[in-house]
């Protein structure tokens, strides 16, 4: 048991070190979804046997380990990437059973260096986050491994997809994808944690199981940290999803409890926008802002795995994650008197605004440290402590005929006096940040202290 904990800790800490070193250099590029641990067969650009981690740790999988052959080569003028990875999960002590096994097979062909297009296909049997936008890794995985707190909910995805994309350098891309997937509920399992090992995990909520056909369109635009404009730029991620399928409603907040099955056909449209602006107002000061809006656009109601929420260290840290019992539930959008295991996200729409001021601190001690320098996993690391002040505001709501402060018509927006708000301060040391946040809209809520490995946004 102890050796298993140590092995898992080494993988997670390695992940945290990589993220921290990137954060310390103000790197804002999106990290790969896995951590390469190296090739076991031979050192070649064309392929080998790869072992990698899913760069997460959670109450459903524990630590997912990916293993299998990979290949990279040229096909005409295109760059070909192939991977056939099996997945074994550490939950239930790496027990060999269907819940602990999965796979991801991918084939990608990319044409062009600075601009061009790419096509690809994949088949997968994996566990996915319901709201990946709220919190970056390794923050979520570290909280689960050390503190037995999982800030995500999870569901199973089994199916295949194809995509085509166009890109220009590293700052603009458009991707169109089609997939056929079976979505399934997953339960929390026997997963280790360093502290609170005698406690129980928060229940992983039941979703609306079903077979669904999904069309996704994603647009990304990122001009952050360009050579001539460090600490400044725009970031935009815009997603549209159309889903069509048959979903099981029984035993969930969207269906009756008095029947064994209640299958309903849903055809829905969902959009999600994440807009950020980074401003360097002096050589050592930044003023950054973020606006998030997402949820139901048209068609039938959203299944549970496509619902949204706000609250917790990733969005409005002055409020505890999945906090209830403080008036109308504008965090998860649970109706009065409805208690659901795991307190799942049920909002059909959410809005979030964040503003952050950062001031880099100057110290001779830090200058001495940075002159000597150290390297973390081969990357140069420098301490650049910054004082941080921030304010957040947001809420979720349901869509339909107006009902109190929880449900609004599709063309209206809740009044700002109903939003949850907080303020906070922090010290970002580069490798990690320590923060305190206090709710403003609910003055009786206690202050929350928390640690982030990566920046808040």
Where are these regions (language model features)?
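Outer-membrane beta-barrel "beta-signal"
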Residues: 217-219, 424, 429-431, 445-457
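Outer-membrane beta-barrel initiation region
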Residues: 22-90, 95-99, 105, 113, ...
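Short, contiguous acidic/charged loop-to-helix segments that flank catalytic cores in large enzymes
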Residues: 263, 339-346, 409-418, 440-441
């Amino acid at each position: 048991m102890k050796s298993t904990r140590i092995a898992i800790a080494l993988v997670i800490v390695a992940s945290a070190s990589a993220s921290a070193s990137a954060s310390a250099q103000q790197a804002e590029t999106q990290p790969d979804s896995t951590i390469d641990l190296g090739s076991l067969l031979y050192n070649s650009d064309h392929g080998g046997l790869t072992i990698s981690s899913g760069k997460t740790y959670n109450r459903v999988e524990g630590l997912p380990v990916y293993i299998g052959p990979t290949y990279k080569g040229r096909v005409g003028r295109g760059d070909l990437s192939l991977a056939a990875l099996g997945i074994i999960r550490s939950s239930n002590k790496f027990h060999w059973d269907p819940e602990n096994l999965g796979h991801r097979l991918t084939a990608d062909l990319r044409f062009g260096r600075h601009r061009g297009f790419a096509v690809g296909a994949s088949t997968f049997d994996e566990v996915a986050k319901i709201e990946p936008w709220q919190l970056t890794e390794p923050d979520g995985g570290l909280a689960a491994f050390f503190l037995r707190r999982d800030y995500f909910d999870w569901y199973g995805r089994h199916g295949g997809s194809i995509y085509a994309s166009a890109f220009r350098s590293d700052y603009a891309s458009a991707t169109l994808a089609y997939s056929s997937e079976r979505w399934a509920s997953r339960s929390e399992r026997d997963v280790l944690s360093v502290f609170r090992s005698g406690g129980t995990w928060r229940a992983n909520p039941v979703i609306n199981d079903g077979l669904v056909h999904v069309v996704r369109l994603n647009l990304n635009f990122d001009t952050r940290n360009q050579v001539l404009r460090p600490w400044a730029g725009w970031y935009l991620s815009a997603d549209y999803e159309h889903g069509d399928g048959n979903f099981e409603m029984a035993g969930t907040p969207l269906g009756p409890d008095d029947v064994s099955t209640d299958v309903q056909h849903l055809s829905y449209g969902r959009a999600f926008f994440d807009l950020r602006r980074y401003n360097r107002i002096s050589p050592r000061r930044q003023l950054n802002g973020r606006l998030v809006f997402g949820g139901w656009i048209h068609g039938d109601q959203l299944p549970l795995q496509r619902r949204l929420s706000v609250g917790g260290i990733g969005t409005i840290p002055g409020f505890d994650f999945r906090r209830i019992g403080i008036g109308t539930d504008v965090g998860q959008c649970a109706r009065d008197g409805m208690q659901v295991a795991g307190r799942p996200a049920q909002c059909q729409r959410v809005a979030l605004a964040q503003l952050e001021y950062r001031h880099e601190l100057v110290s001779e001690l830090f200058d001495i440290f940075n002159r000597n320098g150290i390297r973390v996993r081969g990357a140069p690391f420098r301490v650049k402590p910054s004082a941080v002040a921030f304010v957040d505001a947001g809420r979720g709501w349901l869509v339909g005929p107006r009902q109190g402060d929880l449900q609004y018509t599709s063309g209206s927006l809740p009044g700002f006096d109903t939003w949850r708000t907080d303020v906070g301060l922090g010290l970002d040391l580069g490798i990690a940040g320590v923060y305190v946040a206090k709710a403003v809209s609910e003055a009786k809520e206690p202050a929350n202290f928390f640690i982030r490995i990566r920046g808040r946004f």
